[in-house]
UniProtKB/Swiss-Prot annotation:
Record family assignment: Belongs to the bacterial ribosomal protein bL21 family.
A GO-annotated cellular component: ribosome
GO biological process: translation
HAMAP family: Ribosomal_bL21 (MF_01363)
The keyword Membrane belongs to this UniProt entry's keyword annotation: no
Quaternary structure, from the entry: Part of the 50S ribosomal subunit. Contacts protein L20.
Organism in which the protein naturally occurs: Kocuria rhizophila (strain ATCC 9341 / DSM 348 / NBRC 103217 / DC2201)
GO molecular function: rRNA binding; structural constituent of ribosome
Keyword Ribosomal protein among record annotations: yes
Entry function: This protein binds to 23S rRNA in the presence of protein L20.
Superkingdom of the organism of origin: Bacteria
Protein name: Large ribosomal subunit protein bL21
InterPro entries xrefs: bL21-like, bL21-like_sf, Ribosomal_bL21
Amino acid sequence: MVYAIVRAGGRQEKVSVGDLVTLDRVAGEAGSTVELPALLLVDGDKVTSDSKTLADVKVTAEIIEDLRGPKISIMKYKNKTGYKKRQGFRAELTTVKITGIDA
């Protein structure tokens, strides 16, 4: 089984061909392809972590859809002063399908 550890949106994700992965927003339209940088490659028993070898490894993914994450509520409150502040946040996300790991 071939899998790779890729850097995407400041995080590291373990991916293999055919996986659907949700990442921070990636620039591009649905149906277009993006290339993710590999940090580690495992091909059966062979593990590759050398940066010179990994420069040739291409992990390609197809953008499936853009979406927004769940709403996160942020509440600030100070006792006895009447101060309270409410704020919400939804992360901009992209779902991608890994189409190939070429070493």
